[in-house]
């Protein structure tokens, strides 16, 4: 016998509520008769009239009908596509208020997820001089929409189902962000325009690179068009037909100089990278972040430092200019290979790089057993560094600088270090790597008691 399914009925009418907080994705939160209601484009302290758009057992969703009381932190969004495009979530909030909110989120999560952890000092936030045009890495969806009769290029809409119809992106580097319409119009000229799925963008200190993910082969005429487009716009164009191992550079062809994209994390160091390598999205904040990490490590010429989750050596190589020795450990072997090449190309001789899965036991590894360190830098992915923190006493480091792209996992790991491993949290703060979004980069300093 089939079981009847109960459907919650949507409340009809106009209702009023005060916004008390922001959700993880930037929507306002109101409590209505004890039930959580998510209302986009609202800010804490605002009173709004709203109508329901969706209901479930544990929460409701709604849209604003009228702002009864507006927050002093409200500003006019600088982008005309803000209410539709899901690329940004906080453009209606002043940049000062964005930073304050992110800083408070870090403090709250350290306390609640970290089981009572509180930093002795709050670091002043690292700010960027330009909150627009900062983004040098992005994956842009590509889709032909027959109803619109055109190719869309950009981020998903807020509901996540479709691509947003945009003509520019103000947070992308203008070398790409100002050319969305030009790029989409160009794709329409290709024979397989309906079979291009994605553009992966990476911009170094001088030029943009674009990986074109295609599901059908290009014709020779298409390839000539791609080369011509790349030449006219000073782009490097790569093609990808399947997995990452199928990526190759279409333009420029041959043995050219420079051979790779590159950026300078610190004076005197050039890091070469491929467009699908992980690099930080915001060059300005990245340089400031590296400088702050070096200051917080309080490096002397006799220090031996280990950099875990080191990637291409973004921190490792600048740190090597100040320390006696530095060891970088990274889970992706190809990035380790490139980090070694970069050290050689920059004539840096006091670093070594190793490949290892840092989410598994590492007690049998050469880099763990054959070296001694007194300080550590951690820069893990969103999953955090739980395995490292659970075994931190085996490293016997007196100071840890932890850089995080996820405040929740930083808070969890801080709880391990402070509550279980005899470290104290000296200081913590945020760095505005991602203006106008809910994402934030954080940094924390732990010291052995």
UniProtKB/Swiss-Prot annotation:
Gene3D superfamilies: 2.40.50.1070, Nucleic acid-binding proteins, Vaccinia Virus protein VP39
GO molecular function, a single term: 4 iron, 4 sulfur cluster binding
Binding-site residues for S-adenosyl-L-methionine, renumbered to this chain: 280, 309, 314, 330, 357, 379
EC number of this enzyme: 2.1.1.190
GO biological process: rRNA base methylation
Domain of life: Bacteria
Keywords on record: 4Fe-4S, Iron, Iron-sulfur, Metal-binding, Methyltransferase, rRNA processing, S-adenosyl-L-methionine, Transferase
Domain (TRAM): residue spans on this chain: 1-66
Primary role: Catalyzes the formation of 5-methyl-uridine at position 1939 (m5U1939) in 23S rRNA.
Name this protein carries in UniProt: 23S rRNA (uracil(1939)-C(5))-methyltransferase RlmD
Source organism per UniProt: Francisella tularensis subsp. novicida (strain U112)
């Amino acid at each position: 016998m089939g079981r009847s399914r109960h459907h919650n009925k949507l409340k009809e009418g106009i209702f009023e509520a005060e916004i008390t907080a922001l959700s993880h994705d930037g929507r306002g939160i109101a409590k209505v008769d004890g039930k959580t209601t998510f209302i986009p484009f609202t800010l804490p302290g605002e009173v709004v009239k709203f109508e329901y758009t969706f209901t479930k057992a544990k929460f409701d969703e709604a849209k604003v009908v009228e702002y009864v009381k507006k927050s002093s932190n409200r500003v006019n969004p600088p982008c005309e596509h803000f209410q539709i495009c899901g690329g940004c979530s906080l453009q209606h909030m002043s940049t000062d208020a964005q930073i304050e909110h992110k800083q408070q989120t870090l403090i709250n999560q350290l306390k609640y997820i970290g089981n009572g952890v509180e930093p002795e000092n709050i670091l002043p936030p690292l700010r960027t001089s330009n909150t627009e045009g900062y983004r040098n890495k992005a994956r842009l969806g590509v889709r032909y929409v027959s109803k619109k009769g055109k190719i869309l290029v950009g981020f998903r809409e807020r509901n996540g189902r479709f691509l947003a119809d945009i003509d520019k992106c103000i947070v992308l580097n203008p070398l790409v962000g100002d050319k969305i319409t030009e790029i989409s119009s160009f794709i329409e000229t290709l024979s397989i325009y309906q079979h291009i799925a994605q553009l992966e963008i990476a911009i170094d200190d001088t030029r943009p690179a674009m990986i074109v993910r295609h599901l059908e082969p290009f014709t020779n005429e298409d390839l000539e068009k791609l080369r011509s487009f790349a030449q006219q716009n000073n782009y490097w164009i790569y093609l990808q037909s399947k997995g990452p191992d199928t990526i190759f550079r279409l333009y420029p062809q041959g043995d050219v100089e420079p051979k790779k994209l590159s950026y300078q994390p610190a004076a005197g160091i050039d890091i070469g990278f491929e467009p699908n390598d992980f690099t930080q999205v915001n060059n300005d904040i990245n340089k400031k972040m590296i400088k702050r990490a070096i200051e917080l490590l309080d490096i002397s010429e006799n220090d031996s430092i280990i950099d875990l989750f080191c990637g291409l050596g973004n921190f490792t190589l600048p740190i090597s200019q100040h320390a006696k020795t530095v060891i970088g450990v990274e889970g992706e072997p190809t990035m380790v290979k490139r980090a070694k090449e970069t050290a050689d190309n920059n004539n840096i001789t006091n670093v070594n790089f190793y490949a290892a899965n840092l989410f598994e036991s590492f007690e049998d590894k050469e880099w763990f057993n054959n070296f001694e360190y007194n300080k550590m830098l951690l820069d893990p992915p969103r999953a955090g560094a739980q395995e490292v923190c659970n075994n931190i006493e085996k490293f016997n480091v007196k100071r840890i600088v932890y850089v995080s792209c996820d405040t929740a996992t930083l808070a969890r790991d801080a709880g391990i270090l402070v509550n279980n491993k005899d470290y104290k949290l000296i200081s913590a703060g945020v760095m505005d790597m991602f203006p106008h979004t809910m994402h934030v980069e954080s940094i924390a300093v732990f010291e052995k008691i």
